[in-house]
Amino acid sequence: MTVTGFFTDSTLCIGCKACEVACKEWNEVPADGYAFSGKSYDNTLALGHSTWRHVKFVEGETQAGAGGNLPDMLTWQFSSDVCKHCENAGCLESCPTGSIVRTEFGGVYIQPDICNGCGYCVVNCPFGVVDRRPTDGRAFKCTFCYDRQKEGETPACAKACPTQSILFGDLGELERIADERIAKLHSAGMTDATIWNPKDSSVGGTHAFFLVRGDPARYNLPASPEIPTTALKPAWSAAATAAGVLLGAALLGFALNRR
């Protein structure tokens, strides 16, 4: 079975939100309310229980007008954000019911009929992707269009993208395409373009990676994301060692007292 992924090239994104609409239509995701917040021209703001694809509007520094009566203009970058489907997924590791599973395509899938709404997955996602629906408390996020992939179909968001900013396919092939694309941009003078795929962090790489210009953190892509559960392993080890020492001391004291 082919291990698949998303490669999102933000330099090709035009902010049309076709991916958001296609995702909602295919998955029958409830409406968000669509109200402007005053913080941005974006009307969905972030990923959540009812927004599984989110086109982020990133405002850059003001550039001088091209002459004449043209005003100074903000620079804009757009990027379509989504669940990263981490290799080491904190949500999956922390789920107590087995609701969250790894599919044969490599994606991380929440089975809503098993989810008990405990929320452990929410706090263990390093990207703030997983969110609980307020009506019943169950957790929701991008499904990687598992139903479409099983039928050999492309996920709705990638199929709807008019500029091929969102590419879907074999993960290894997408990484090769990304390397070629970044080399082309650098040769064209866009030296601030970079690939974000945190393979050296505790998430171990992702099945959704991005090409962005400037600091990836501006696109809600942290430089070194960490899974909260990784801190538990040394903590449990230290606790077990301490318990062993205390037990040994107690047994030694008991033996000495019997003499």
Model-assigned labels for residue ranges:
Residues 1-259:
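Non-ligating segments of multi-cofactor redox enzymes
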